[in-house]
A protein has these predicted regions:
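...with weaker cross-activation on analogous glycine-rich loops/strands in unrelated enzymes
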Residues: 57-125
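N-terminal capping segments
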Residues: 1-69
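Polar low-complexity intrinsically disordered regions
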Residues: 1, 102, 133-136
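Glycine- and charge-enriched low-complexity intrinsically disordered segments
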Residues: 126-145
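Intrinsically disordered, low-complexity regions enriched in small/polar residues
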Residues: 24, 55-58, 71, 111, ...
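Long hydrophobic alpha-helices with heptad-repeat/coiled-coil character
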Residues: 1-13, 116-129
């Protein structure tokens, strides 16, 4: 898939996901990131995990069984189709993973905005990129090669 095809696929994906309700196991932030990987890199983890868990702990168990990982950071570090880059080099389509206290959250970089699963609105939505906030947290940025 060339860069133009990736951008078109990403635009279609954002259009599909934006404003969907937030549902753990379907449209939580990790599932959104896995859906991006499915469309841009052909990784099938999204299909294997979709609607298979209702809690984050359940998601970790199912992911360990189906994909061999229980933490998305560990999984992304092992995928040959991803390369880790600095936040300063992030561009459209990159996945930013932020380490929270008990889990990792993912947002999809879209230039001046990010696609994110919001606990506040219970929807998938576009939000402003706050680089200072991201830099203040433990994070990694991944790009599909």
């Amino acid at each position: 898939m060339n860069s133009f095809q990736k951008e078109v696929a990403l635009i279609e994906l954002v259009d599909e996901l934006a404003h969907l309700p937030f549902v753990i196991g379907q449209t939580d932030c990790n599932m959104v990131a896995l859906k991006v990987l499915k469309h841009l890199a052909g990784i099938d983890w999204y299909d294997r995990l979709y609607n298979r868990y209702k809690t984050y702990a359940g998601g970790a168990r199912v992911a360990k069984k189906e994909a061999g990982y229980s933490n998305i950071l560990h999984a992304f570090n092992e995928l040959d189709c991803l390369e880790q880059i600095s936040l300063e080099h992030a561009t459209v389509g990159d996945i930013i993973v932020i380490r929270e206290k008990h889990f990792s959250s993912c947002v999809i970089h879209l230039g001046q905005q990010v696609l994110m699963a919001s606990h506040m609105t219970n929807k998938i939505e576009l939000g402003h990129v706050d680089y200072d906030e991201i830099k203040a947290q433990v994070h990694k940025v991944y790009r599909v090669k």
